[in-house]
Amino acid sequence: MSSEFLAELRWEDGFAIPVANEENKTLEEQLSKLQDERSSMQDQLRDYEDRINAMTSHFKNVKQEFLFTQSLCKARDHEIESEEHFKMIAERELGRVKDEIQRLENEITSIREKKNDKENSIFKTTQKLDGLKCQMNWDQQALEAWLEESAHKDSDALTLQKYAQQDDNKIRALTLQLERLTVECNQRRKVLDNEFAETLSVQLELDKAAQDFRKIHNERQKLILQWESTIEQMQKRDKDIDNCAVALARIKQEIREKENLVKEKIKFLENEIGNNTEYEKKISVADRKVLKCRTEYQRHEANRIQLKDELDSLKATVNRSSSDLEALRKNISKVKMDINEETARLGKIKNHNQIVRKKLKEITEKTMSVEEKATNLEDMLREEERGVKEVEVQLNIVKDVLFKKVQELQTETMKEKALVSEIEGTRSSLKHLNHQLHKLDFETLQQQEIMYAQDFYIQQVERRMSRLKGDINSEEKQALEAKTVELQKTLEEKKSALCLLETQIKKLHNDLYFTKKSNSKYRDEKQSLMTKINELTLFNDRSEKELTKAKALKQDLMIEDNLLKLEVKRTRELLHSKAEEVLSLEKRKQQLHTAMEERTEEIKVHKTMLASQIRYVDQERQNVSAEFHERLSKIDKLKNRYEILTVVMLPPEGEEEKTQAYYVIKQALVNNQMEKTGRSYEEEYSFVPMRIYDLVNQVQEINAWCCMSVPRSFQKVTPSSAEYEVKIQLEEQKRAVDEKYRYKQRQIRELQEDIQSMENTLTVIEHLTNNVKEKVTEKQAYVLQLNRETEEQKPKLERVTKQCAKLTKEVRLLKDTKDETLEEQDIKLREVKQLHKIIDEMIVDITQENAEIGVILQTYFQQSGLELPTTSTKGSRHSSRSPSQTSLLSARSSKSTSTSASQTSIKVLELNFPASPLTGSTSRPTSASSASSTGKSRKTNK
């Protein structure tokens, strides 16, 4: 600097250089001190201005937050008012429902009283009819005495006619009154139905209004929650802005401090730039070679992976085809075994029928007359032929069902193959696409590195050209400053755009969540409506059934009325004939004989009618019991399957039972934690490039300043110098920053991949849980349907049991016995054997479906000293029927009663399975055999 200045002044070398005096030196020192004070004061002024701006912005944010909190408080007050209103509406609805329940209970009590009155009247009329029948069954002596008295009193006949006419008039009046009452009842029922429909419509309207109010209330709550979340976000952002302002002031101070250090070290940096360029050229050549090698390696690796995937897919197809072939073979063998078992069963049944026929012939020849033998044999033959036909029909149905199931299995296997092939194809295509993506990412990184190298080289060339030309770099500096300002503006715009996009994404997520909620609500409403429709259809079916029953009862009453009228007419004719033929005793005897013959014929007809009714009732009872046993077996199978599922899904020992919601919540918490860590890494990563960019700008400014003020020094720097050590430290810092930057990038990628995998697993778990929920709902609906059917069948079963009890009483009266007959014992034994057979089949099916339950059942049966039934025991049970039935049909009653009593005693076996999660109260106390046996014992007691 001094040499240049002297050259400009044309100072000769021989003369001494002029130096400032002491006054000038003091002035220069004062000037430098004042300049330092001025710079420090300017720095303080800038700091104060920044603080003032930060405080003003903070004050604005506080005001806005205060307004938001006030509006939130108002919204909360409105919400509390709406909640209170909603509570009042619910209380009113509850009161209305209680009144309705009370009204229904009163109606039920009144209907019960009416029913009791009707039953009492029916009982009284039956007693009267029994009295009339007893009066009709007079002895012959009483008739003769009455005839002798009637011969003396002819006027009694006229009085009887008068009474009969009066009875007819009364009957007509009663029938008219009954018709009038039925018309009134129908009218009242119509009025009641109309009122019921009106109340239902009003109730539906009220329900709709309540639902609309609930929807509006929920929407308002959602808006308030959104509002709260926005306020929280704004508060967080305000805090972040404050922190950023403090950090910015601190960074500015640090920058000012570092600027002084950087100015001193620029000279050393410029000397080393040339060496760095040469080394960078060499490094770029080596990097290109490495990139070529990497690309070749990746290409070979991709080919290897593709070939491996193809090999795996071929292996999977081979394994699948072999498993399908084995499954088809197993199905064919199973079908053949079933056909052989059914044929053997049919042969055993035929042999059993022949043995029973022989035994029946022997017994009937001993005990019955010729006519009764013929009728009974014909009836037995018809029943046996009917049973054989039913067995054949069942065999055909089973064969058709088996054929259909085989066809369905084949179609399902074909579908499964197609789906597996599609999945494998999509997997291979996915792998190929992922490989292409990695390849493209790698290529982009290579291109970016090349671009950076080229840009750096261009900048160096431009600097050299400018230095060679000798241009002043003030314009470049201004241009760079303008560029920095523009870039900062663009950066702020992009930041604002990013914030807007994030808010829009959050809003879209919230909208998506609300739409999903509304869809689920609509589905629930649809399900509730469907259940209501089903209940209405069931109500209609029940009402139709009750109507048919009422019609049948009315027809029976009409028939009984007609029979009574016929009997009355016959008695009148007898009275008239006997009154006219009092004198001739022979005619009287003949008339009595004819009356006795008619009476015996009527008794015979009545007996035949009773026998036919007994047969019909027996058939109905057998059908009802068969249906009831089938449904019980279905329910037990479903319960067993459900218990197996719950056992499989139970947690291991020592751990608490975890529900599906627990896993969903756990997954959501993990996702939230991963998202938070990802955001923190992204924030750190966003600050790193900004710092690098600032450092690059600073270096460029330093270079420009060096070009302006300081001439380039051509002296070489020694390794022992301080500048060389500073350069090494700066290079180490740069390397550390680069390594941190790469490490953070790698962590961000790993976190993104982890988040993606967790989201995929979450979707899979949600899909599985939805499938399980659908299955559970289907099973629950099926169980409810079965329960309804059983409840509908209960009254039928009670009626049938009552009819059976009446018929057994009549049969015992006919046979003059109070003990159980052989037929009753035979029926009970057959029922018990049928029940044993159903239980054995259920146990065999369960053991075939699940081997673990088979092992558990084996242990329980061994503990109780019983044998576990297998497929072989099914056939043996059929063969063991014939000797038991022949022993029952033998003539020795004492032995038959003892065998029936021994066979009806069923051994109860307790199976303590683990508790199911849905019931949760107790484990299943007894097996299906014990439950069904207790049910049978109750029937027999009735």
Curated annotation (Swiss-Prot):
Function: Required for assembly of dynein regulatory complex (DRC) and inner dynein arm (IDA) complexes, which are responsible for ciliary beat regulation, thereby playing a central role in motility in cilia and flagella. Probably acts together with CCDC40 to form a molecular ruler that determines the 96 nanometer (nm) repeat length and arrangements of components in cilia and flagella. Not required for outer dynein arm complexes assembly.
Keywords: Cell projection, Cilium, Coiled coil, Cytoplasm, Cytoskeleton, Phosphoprotein
Family the entry assigns: Belongs to the CCDC39 family.
GO cellular component, one term: axoneme
Stretches of the chain forming a coiled coil according to its record: 16-124, 164-424, 457-605, 729-768, 796-826
Chain spans, region Disordered: 868-942
Highest rank taxon of the organism: Eukaryota
Residue spans crossing the bilayer: none
Protein source organism: Bos taurus (Bovine)
Name under which the protein is recorded: Coiled-coil domain-containing protein 39
Subcellular location: Cytoplasm, Cytoskeleton, Cilium axoneme
Residues recorded as bearing Phosphoserine in the entry: S894, S902
Low complexity bias: start-end ranges: 881-905, 919-935
Biological process according to GO: axonemal dynein complex assembly; cilium-dependent cell motility; epithelial cilium movement involved in determination of left/right asymmetry; inner dynein arm assembly
Keyword Phosphoprotein tagged: yes
